[in-house]
Amino acid sequence: MAARVLIIGSGGREHTLAWKLAQSHHVKQVLVAPGNAGTACSEKISNTAISISDHTALAQFCKEKKIEFVVVGPEAPLAAGIVGNLRSAGVQCFGPTAEAAQLESSKRFAKEFMDRHGIPTAQWKAFTKPEEACSFILSADFPALVVKASGLAAGKGVIVAKSKEEACKAVQEIMQEKAFGAAGETIVIEELLDGEEVSCLCFTDGKTVAPMPPAQDHKRLLEGDGGPNTGGMGAYCPAPQVSNDLLLKIKDTVLQRTVDGMQQEGTPYTGILYAGIMLTKNGPKVLEFNCRFGDPECQVILPLLKSDLYEVIQSTLDGLLCTSLPVWLENHTALTVVMASKGYPGDYTKGVEITGFPEAQALGLEVFHAGTALKNGKVVTHGGRVLAVTAIRENLISALEEAKKGLAAIKFEGAIYRKDVGFRAIAFLQQPRSLTYKESGVDIAAGNMLVKKIQPLAKATSRSGCKVDLGGFAGLFDLKAAGFKDPLLASGTDGVGTKLKIAQLCNKHDTIGQDLVAMCVNDILAQGAEPLFFLDYFSCGKLDLSVTEAVVAGIAKACGKAGCALLGGETAEMPDMYPPGEYDLAGFAVGAMERDQKLPHLERITEGDVVVGIASSGLHSNGFSLVRKIVAKSSLQYSSPAPDGCGDQTLGDLLLTPTRIYSHSLLPVLRSGHVKAFAHITGGGLLENIPRVLPEKLGVDLDAQTWRIPRVFSWLQQEGHLSEEEMARTFNCGVGAVLVVSKEQTEQILRDIQQHKEEAWVIGSVVARAEGSPRVKVKNLIESMQINGSVLKNGSLTNHFSFEKKKARVAVLISGTGSNLQALIDSTREPNSSAQIDIVISNKAAVAGLDKAERAGIPTRVINHKLYKNRVEFDSAIDLVLEEFSIDIVCLAGFMRILSGPFVQKWNGKMLNIHPSLLPSFKGSNAHEQALETGVTVTGCTVHFVAEDVDAGQIILQEAVPVKRGDTVATLSERVKLAEHKIFPAALQLVASGTVQLGENGKICWVKEE
């Protein structure tokens, strides 16, 4: 692709924007209106004289020049409504509307907005009468020394007074002497804040906020921050005074809160949001908002952008910034120094020749023009701030030294510039500061807060033998106080495995703690041990208090169910060890039993003993790597409704059903002396856990028809096409634990178990096994799952979900309303449908077809064709999504792109399109016009396989439609659409069911007649 973009403005900011956009392979030309000498004539960049104040003429110019989008640099056009006017004319424009730009154009509006939305800012009051303003300055209970013109004043409308008298004088200058014209008709008197000022900018599409690295500007003309205010004499980025944690706080409390507030007030804000922030001892506070890049901040921020600026802007315009978040160059600093004309910010001379550009560029520096012009082939001064020299180096001091070399190379008479840009950061970095543990990523205060929150939860698990009191070096347990006489100790440790991944994806952390406790206490129960106390280990990269508290609360609750004390634990915050949002868990259980109650009694187990199965609650905590793989290949998301028969819950909730804890209910049964062995069915499933409690040369035969198998296992088996052995070796298949008992004691044991509210069955028997033969055999497992996945109708079993014929997975490609999409959705929702729509892909954002898909719960993707160099690249991006969703058939429903040959060949015989005529008549995009012009009395529509030649593929179905007297294109189109809604779904069903195929000879083949 080769796009043309237009930038509005003439300063250093606009030159920087043009320079960065020209680096994109998507861009063939950058036009700048009106531009300067730096944007006049480079390889991709040139100026245009089009008026930027006549928005109607500008819109027409954009259409004639095929401008992809317009980027507005300065604030005045934004306040004048350029964005809304261009968008109304059908031209994409990057920036906020005039209504949203009031954040900058009206200081009063901005302050009132911040107050409404709780955005931290200085105390203030607005005035339209100078005497009232002065009275307020003199009587305020805070230093009311900042006087601001409420309107736009080219960045110079702020006066910071040193005394109340000076502040009153500033009021007179602004309001009576009209120092800033109409901008000063309303003024804002503000509290003087103490601290350092930084610039925090972000991209935003009205929802997502993508912060840029923080920068610091230098407003004063002279070194040491002396002299008058200017538009900015230099900047550097990133500002080390803003830590990552502080930037995140500014993002949440200022940038995101502002964007959310504008959305709530019905004025969505898109483009660049710039917050001038004062770093006070009470936290960051907003000094002002700007609605565009700062100048000269732009000259140090964009050089650090690694991403393609064109793609970032396009995704912002499309409302998809979250899919194209900018990436920034790390471990580098950009520093820029502005060279200004003699006399600036007052009167200055224009037309002074500038030399030395080649020498500066030879040093590896970027020179961004601002107030420059071309005169007789020479670059001359044409403004107060003339240009900026930018250096990008590994550190701030190196960048400043390199920039100074460029300043020495570039010469023009009377040039003034500062040599101390970055002095505050250098002083900050040179301060003797000891590194804190928190700066390295470990927040001890947050850890202490967590302990306070979980202490009462742990304390509630105290039991005989143990009084829980967190905070010591170790916990104690008194076996004698717990009633033991001659005890043995048993210990077990376990984790939760990749079930954690699902909990983290579903943001559901309150039940995973029970899984951890259950896995440990059920293991020691196999020794006959009563769980006494439990210890947990929680590790993460960054401590999230709410998540960690939810997990530990779940652990404490589970300890209560198990009858053990949560005696202690470890919360390990380890920066860089885990990605954001991820954590890991491990648990340790210690239990005890009297010496004569130890299990298993291997010497007592004999051939003919009975195997009793105890019901599981579901998957428990094993096999989740396989589960996640199956879900990824299925048509369901974790947020989808669970499969039929699995309850009114999401798939994620179903899979996260916590592991059953057996200690409280089964311990009395185990202590009866009638149980010979207990096996916890954990990793390794039925096949590998039961042999762990059997003597050599003995095994078990199990019959799956004797127990209830939860339907989730049937769904997993069907979706994953899992073998009987794979199911039995991976999952518990509905049996969470197994007891081995004698035949004589079986009925009593079953009664005892059921008394304790557990579901149990006789599921098999102990048998002799020859050496080398399988220790566990399970019969009827797959058959039981088939029945389990079925329902009884009219006395016979019919498939419910598990073994119905697999439906063809369909992708629908659209460009707009997707006129046939709804008909396809409705058809595939029918119970006997042979197809299911798994993904809808659009090459345009925010179109009606996407809304239809989302309402139907179908995943959507937007793949913007404008971001790709050619059709093949674009089609390859689509193909990746089709592979991701394991698509079988592609339907084109109003997809307005011509597909490339390789893509069509790959999907030959698997891609359908519909055309609004009876092909081969009236091919092309104006079929209805052709039908009306030729005077035919019958037209219609055709569903066909897609071929490389347009509308030339093999015909699957056709439907005739009469052409009536007096028909127009509109009336005929509506009548044909009704026929399309009928035959497109029908054709899809024919192909999905295998009734119609494209034969090897390239002709339609009817495999069977319906």
From Swiss-Prot:
Catalytic activity: 5-phospho-beta-D-ribosylamine + glycine + ATP = N(1)-(5-phospho-beta-D-ribosyl)glycinamide + ADP + phosphate + H(+); N(1)-(5-phospho-beta-D-ribosyl)glycinamide + (6R)-10-formyltetrahydrofolate = N(2)-formyl-N(1)-(5-phospho-beta-D-ribosyl)glycinamide + (6S)-5,6,7,8-tetrahydrofolate + H(+); 2-formamido-N(1)-(5-O-phospho-beta-D-ribosyl)acetamidine + ATP = 5-amino-1-(5-phospho-beta-D-ribosyl)imidazole + ADP + phosphate + H(+)
N-acetylalanine: modified positions: A2
Region feature GART domain, mapped onto this chain: 810-1010
List of residues binding (6R)-10-formyltetrahydrofolate: R871, M896, R897, I898, L899, N913, A947, E948, D949, V950, D951
Domain spans labelled ATP-grasp: 111-318
Gene3D superfamilies tied to this protein: 3.40.50.20, ATP-grasp fold, A domain, ATP-grasp fold, B domain, Formyl transferase, N-terminal domain, Phosphoribosylglycinamide synthetase, C-terminal domain, PurM-like C-terminal domain, PurM-like, N-terminal domain
Annotated PROSITE patterns: ATP_GRASP, GARS, GART
Site residues by UniProt (Raises pKa of active site His): D951
The UniProt record lists the keyword Cytoplasm: no
GO biological process: 'de novo' AMP biosynthetic process; 'de novo' IMP biosynthetic process; 'de novo' XMP biosynthetic process; adenine biosynthetic process; brainstem development; cerebellum development; cerebral cortex development; GMP biosynthetic process
Pathway annotation: Purine metabolism; IMP biosynthesis via de novo pathway; 5-amino-1-(5-phospho-D-ribosyl)imidazole from N(2)-formyl-N(1)-(5-phospho-D-ribosyl)glycinamide: step 2/2; Purine metabolism; IMP biosynthesis via de novo pathway; N(1)-(5-phospho-D-ribosyl)glycinamide from 5-phospho-alpha-D-ribose 1-diphosphate: step 2/2; Purine metabolism; IMP biosynthesis via de novo pathway; N(2)-formyl-N(1)-(5-phospho-D-ribosyl)glycinamide from N(1)-(5-phospho-D-ribosyl)glycinamide (10-formyl THF route): step 1/1
UniProt keyword terms in alphabetical order: Acetylation, ATP-binding, Ligase, Magnesium, Manganese, Metal-binding, Multifunctional enzyme, Nucleotide-binding, Phosphoprotein, Purine biosynthesis, Transferase
Region (AIRS domain) residue spans: 434-809
Cofactor: binding details: Binds 1 magnesium or manganese ion per subunit.
Residues the record lists as N6-acetyllysine modifications: K350
Assembly and oligomerization: Homodimer.
Family: In the N-terminal section; belongs to the GARS family. In the central section; belongs to the AIR synthase family.
Name of the protein: Trifunctional purine biosynthetic protein adenosine-3
UniProt organism field: Homo sapiens (Human)
Gene giving rise to this polypeptide: GART
